[in-house]
Amino acid sequence: MSDSPCLSPPAPSQGPTTPRKGPPKFKQRQTRQFKSKPPKKGVKGFGDDIPGMEGLGTDITVICPWEAFSHLELHELAQFGII
């Protein structure tokens, strides 16, 4: 045979050489930050007005959060983590 230039075998077709990346990973915030200030309590302390609570004094604070925040809607209470 003669010394003719050899044809090299065709290069195998390869896909992209960059490795495939998964979805981005998100870090969860440790503290909850609110854009607005939490609501203030509307009613503080009932004293002896509550039936069955006589004798506890007049310096007691609200027992039930829905009584303290009765002027707000449920979604507003949930927004600030009150309920």
Swiss-Prot record:
This is Retinal cone rhodopsin-sensitive cGMP 3',5'-cyclic phosphodiesterase subunit gamma. One of its GO terms (cellular component) is photoreceptor outer segment membrane. Keywords: cGMP, Hydrolase, Sensory transduction, Vision. Its EC number is 3.1.4.35. It holds the Pfam family PDE6_gamma. Residues 22-43 have a biased composition (Basic residues). The keyword Hydrolase applies. Tetramer composed of two catalytic chains (alpha and beta), and two inhibitory chains (gamma). One of its GO terms (biological process) is positive regulation of MAPK cascade. Belongs to the rod/cone cGMP-PDE gamma subunit family. Residues 1-51 are annotated as: Disordered. It is an enzyme of class 3 (hydrolase). Participates in processes of transmission and amplification of the visual signal. cGMP-PDEs are the effector molecules in G-protein-mediated phototransduction in vertebrate rods and cones. InterPro entries: PDE6_gamma, PDE6_gamma_sf. GO terms for molecular function: 3',5'-cyclic-GMP phosphodiesterase activity; cGMP binding. The C-terminal region is important in conferring inhibition. It catalyses: 3',5'-cyclic GMP + H2O = GMP + H(+).
